[in-house]
């Protein structure tokens, strides 16, 4: 089974090797038929302390690192865009 990958914005990077990522999802309310936005914060492992507040990042499911931390940082979009720009 493939690991889930989510995209979100870093809202906190205060703890060592941990970031908090806010992931927003949109869905149509079953009764009101209106598009609703809901967000959830995920704690993710950031081995290199690379992510900064405000960056858009991808996180993926992984083994439990602690009681609340079961996601890990895959890449941040700024670094991916920079790498693509230098490679071209």
From Swiss-Prot:
GO MF assignments:
rRNA binding; structural constituent of ribosome
Arranged from A to Z, the UniProt key words for this protein are:
Ribonucleoprotein, Ribosomal protein, RNA-binding, rRNA-binding
User: What is one GO cellular-component annotation here?
Assistant: cytosolic small ribosomal subunit
Q: Does the record bear Iron in its keywords?
A: no
Biological process (GO) annotations held by this record are:
translation
Q: Which Pfam families match?
A: Ribosomal_S17
| Keyword Transcription regulation in record | no
User: Which domain of life does this protein belong to?
Assistant: Bacteria
Tell me which Gene3D superfamilies the record gives: Nucleic acid-binding proteins (2.40.50.140)
Question: Known InterPro entries for this protein?
Answer: NA-bd_OB-fold (IPR012340), Ribosomal_uS17 (IPR000266), Ribosomal_uS17_bact/chlr (IPR019984)
Q: How does it assemble?
A: Part of the 30S ribosomal subunit.
Check the record and name the HAMAP family matching this protein: Ribosomal_uS17_B
Q: What does this protein do?
A: One of the primary rRNA binding proteins, it binds specifically to the 5'-end of 16S ribosomal RNA.
By sequence similarity, the record places it as follows: Belongs to the universal ribosomal protein uS17 family.
Name of the protein in question: Small ribosomal subunit protein uS17
The organism's taxonomic lineage, starting at the top: Bacteria, Pseudomonadati, Pseudomonadota, Alphaproteobacteria, Hyphomicrobiales
Q: Which gene underlies this protein?
A: rpsQ
């Amino acid at each position: 089974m493939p690991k889930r990958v989510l995209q979100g914005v870093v809202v906190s990077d205060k703890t060592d090797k941990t970031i908090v990522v806010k992931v927003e999802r949109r869905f149509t309310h079953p009764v009101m038929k209106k598009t609703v936005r809901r967000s959830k914060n995920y704690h993710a492992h950031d081995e290199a302390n690379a992510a900064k507040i405000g960056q858009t990042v991808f996180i993926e499911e992984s083994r439990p690192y602690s009681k609340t931390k079961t996601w890990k940082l895959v890449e941040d979009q700024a670094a991916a865009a920079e790498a693509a720009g230098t490679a071209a």
